[in-house]
């Protein structure tokens, strides 16, 4: 068995050390280091970090983007812009691609259209949704549509204890809402305040939803690999009257990915379930800026940083964004490897040779690197297990019948 790296006591001890910090108010976590949080527009409360570090009488400003959101995302304000820094660490989750532009009106019209079709069939609407942000975004949009009488008085059940708790957190911070959400809150008396909205608490309440028709069930997890959503899919996925709506990214190897890509049968809790429900997808909710969104955020920078470190993405995504920044923005952009270190005071790269004095013609000078040690950690047992499960799923999909699937799995078991 795998031993946990921490337990509940460790978690409680860590939580007891947390303290909240207001945005835009600098604080000093250590001597000669000042930190300021700015709105990142990714999820409620998300921030990018401005760090001013002073050493030997010299100060360097480092900005760490973390996850950056898109402009015009539901509820929360657009990401702040920052004009100047010495060094930038920027994410690249979608650094190599752009999504189709989906406006607010297009998104709302699609919801109304899908709801209308589902209600005609007389079944349930099942929506796998992340507990954080996605559930609240959907409730916000559904509230707008109900206010405009674009969708009926169909009951909406949020069947996720975590989503319920997070929704309460949203209600505490109206100062984070954008202008549209603020207006909705004023007009409706609350951002999620409608008699058709219901939050389940107990497992028994969740089970009772199986007995109801003409309802909407929002439940986690968003990729259908855990949580109450698996029970709702098991009981409803087979029925042609029902509709399943995907509103978020479905990672390779997940149950949500299989269903959204058109699988005719899936296994849930060891039972083979036919996919008879109508499968729909609604776009426009991503909390991640795509390539154009990242470039738009970077456009606010008035003078190119001394160096931009492109991180937090698949290698091809990071390389694509770095290449664009070098080619079109004349940024010095690099994709650092895990274990590399950089001296920001003299701006030299840390590697395996002695430190040399930097001159204007030398980009990086190697001093020390722990990259080889880190390389062996990049793919740990959890990564390898995930890869194995993906390969097994692919193997099963290519089998023509149950007999072949059993034979292939038995061969794998024999190898073990």
What does each model-found stretch correspond to?
Residues 112-255, 266-267, 302, 317-319, ...:
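Hard-cation-handling environments
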Residues 1-137, 141-155, 176-179:
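His/Asp/Glu-rich metal-coordinating catalytic cores
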Residues 33-37, 169-176, 295, 345-358:
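Short, surface-exposed amphipathic charged segments that create phosphate/polyanion-binding patches used
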Residues 239, 314-360:
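C-terminal, active-site-flanking charged/polar segments
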């Amino acid at each position: 068995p795998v031993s946990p790296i921490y337990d509940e006591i460790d978690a409680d001890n860590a939580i007891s050390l947390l303290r909240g910090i207001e945005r835009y108010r600098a604080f000093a976590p250590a001597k000669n280091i000042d930190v300021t949080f700015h709105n990142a527009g990714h999820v409620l409360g998300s921030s990018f970090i401005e760090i001013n570090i002073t050493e030997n009488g010299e100060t360097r400003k480092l900005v760490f983007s973390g996850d950056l959101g898109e402009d015009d995302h539901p509820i929360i304000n657009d990401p702040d812009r920052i004009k100047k820094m010495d060094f930038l660490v920027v994410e690249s989750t979608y650094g190599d691609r752009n999504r189709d532009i989906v406006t607010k009106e297009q998104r709302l019209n699609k919801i109304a259209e899908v709801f209308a079709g589902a209600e005609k069939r007389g079944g349930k609407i099942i929506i796998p949704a992340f507990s954080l942000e996605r559930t609240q975004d959907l409730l916000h949009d559904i509230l707008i549509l109900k206010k405009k009488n674009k969708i009926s008085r169909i009951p909406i059940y949020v069947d996720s204890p975590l989503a319920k708790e997070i929704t309460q957190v949203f209600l505490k911070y109206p100062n984070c809402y954008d202008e549209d959400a603020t207006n909705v809150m004023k007009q409706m008396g609350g951002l999620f305040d409608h008699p058709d909205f219901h939050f389940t608490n107990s497992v028994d309440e969740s089970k009772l939803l199986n007995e109801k028709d003409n309802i909407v069930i929002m439940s986690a997890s968003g990729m259908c690999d855990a949580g109450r959503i698996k029970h709702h899919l098991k009981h409803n996925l087979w029925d042609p009257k029902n509709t399943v709506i995907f509103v978020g990214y479905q990672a390779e190897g997940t149950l949500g990915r299989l269903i959204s890509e058109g699988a005719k049968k899936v296994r849930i809790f060891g039972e083979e379930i036919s996919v008879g429900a109508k499968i729909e997808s609604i776009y426009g909710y991503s909390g991640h800026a795509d390539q154009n969104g990242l470039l738009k955020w970077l456009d606010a920078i008035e003078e190119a940083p001394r160096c931009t470190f492109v991180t937090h993405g698949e290698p091809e995504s990071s390389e694509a964004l770095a290449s664009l920044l070098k080619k079109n923005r004349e940024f010095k952009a690099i994709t650092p490897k895990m274990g590399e270190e950089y001296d920001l005071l003299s701006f030299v790269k840390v590697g395996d040779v002695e430190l040399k004095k930097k001159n204007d013609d030398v980009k990086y000078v190697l001093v020390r690197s722990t990259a080889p040690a880190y390389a062996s950690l990049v793919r740990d047992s959890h990564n390898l297990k995930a890869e194995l499960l993906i390969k097994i799923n692919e193997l099963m999909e290519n089998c023509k019948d149950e007999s072949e699937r059993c034979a292939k799995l038995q061969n794998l078991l024999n190898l073990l």
